[in-house]
From Swiss-Prot:
Regions that span the bilayer: none
Pfam families: Fapy_DNA_glyco, H2TH, zf-FPG_IleRS
Classification via InterPro entries: DNA_glyclase/AP_lyase_DNA-bd, DNA_glyclase_Znf_dom_DNA_BS, FPG_cat, MutM-like_N-ter, Ribosomal_uS13-like_H2TH, Znf_DNA_glyclase/AP_lyase, Znf_FPG/IleRS
Keywords: DNA damage, DNA repair, DNA-binding, Glycosidase, Hydrolase, Lyase, Metal-binding, Multifunctional enzyme, Zinc, Zinc-finger
Enzyme Commission number(s) of this protein: 3.2.2.-, 4.2.99.18
Swiss-Prot/TrEMBL induction comment: Expressed in mid-log phase.
SUPFAM superfamilies per the UniProt record, alphabetical: Glucocorticoid receptor-like (DNA-binding domain) (SSF57716), N-terminal domain of MutM-like DNA repair proteins (SSF81624), S13-like H2TH domain (SSF46946)
Catalytic activity as recorded in UniProt: 2'-deoxyribonucleotide-(2'-deoxyribose 5'-phosphate)-2'-deoxyribonucleotide-DNA = a 3'-end 2'-deoxyribonucleotide-(2,3-dehydro-2,3-deoxyribose 5'-phosphate)-DNA + a 5'-end 5'-phospho-2'-deoxyribonucleoside-DNA + H(+)
GO term, biological process aspect, one: DNA repair
Protein name, as recorded: Endonuclease 8 1
UniProt similarity note: Belongs to the FPG family.
Length: 268
């Protein structure tokens, strides 16, 4: 599932390509047809993201709410200069076409037209988003410090922190030497503050670069991060391999239905 930085990149891209002008909206698949018809020809006011949720705000009130889930994708394309649009390929839930660019949405968990009040309801269920300037980490800390749930599970709970997925979860805990099974109430406030600030920095890098980069230079053999063979993670999907820091064996287990990865030597 795409993590939060991906949705913020999409919001920035769609803001740049479509905002401020009328947009043609359709639903070749048909499942979004009624809403698409009501949106067609409206001006996109802005695009925004909160965690793993994308919002397209149109002049006049309607907001398209998208959650990609496990399988959703946007395919971006440049509008041909001859005026002919490409035929939709596959099950396109929503197609947006602007003056110079188009995008096709396939396979989302959610694609719906809602109003501002319903947007507020969605956001009210979410924790702070590290990529938003209005993020309030104290609300996440207040939930974590009272919880007996493992910190590895709490980080994936979108009501605690919005936008963190399995890669950032595993890598953040490794970088701060925290066992994913440790109860939330066993996390000290200085540990939380350091991890939050690190998460903000890591996700900003992901937003800027378009990929998750978490390995520190001292563990990366001095290679620049754009090399194709660069080690991209410390523990994620590295079960049975040696730890990049201590040489111990990376372990994996299920934690509330999701795979968690950690180094039993480095993380306590």
């Amino acid at each position: 599932m795409p993590e939060g930085h991906t949705l913020h990149r999409l919001a920035r891209l769609h803001q740049r390509r479509f905002a401020g002008a009328p947009v043609s909206v359709s639903s070749p698949q048909g499942r979004f047809a009624d809403s698409a018809s009501a949106l067609n020809g409206r001006v996109l006011r802005r695009a925004s993201a909160w965690g793993k949720h994308l919002f397209h705000h149109y002049v006049g009130g309607p907001v398209v709410h998208v959650h990609l889930g496990l399988y959703g994708t946007f395919t971006e394309w440049a509008r041909p200069t001859d005026g002919w649009l490409p035929e939709p390929a596959g099950q396109v839930r929503m197609r947006m076409v602007g003056a110079e660019f188009g995008t096709d949405l396939r396979g989302p968990t959610v694609c719906e037209s809602i109003d501002d009040g319903e947007v507020a309801d969605v956001v009210a269920r979410l924790g702070p988003d590290p990529l938003r300037s209005d993020a309030n980490p104290s609300s996440a800390w207040s939930r974590i410090t009272k919880s007996r749930r493992p910190i590895g599970a709490l980080l994936m709970d979108q009501t605690v922190i919005a936008g963190v997925g399995n890669v950032y979860r595993n890598e953040l805990l490794f970088r701060h030497r925290i066992d994913p099974q440790r109860p939330g109430r066993g996390i000290g406030e200085p540990e939380f503050d350091a991890a939050w600030n690190d998460l903000v920095s890591l996700m900003k890098v992901g937003l800027r670069r378009g990929k998750i980069i978490v390995v520190r230079p001292e563990h990366d053999h001095g290679l620049p991060s754009y090399l194709p063979d660069r080690p991209r993670t410390y523990v994620y999907r590295r079960a049975g391999e040696p730890c990049r820091v201590c040489g111990g064996v990376i372990r994996t287990a299920l934690l509330e239905g999701r795979n968690v990865f950690w180094c039993p030597v480095c993380q306590t």
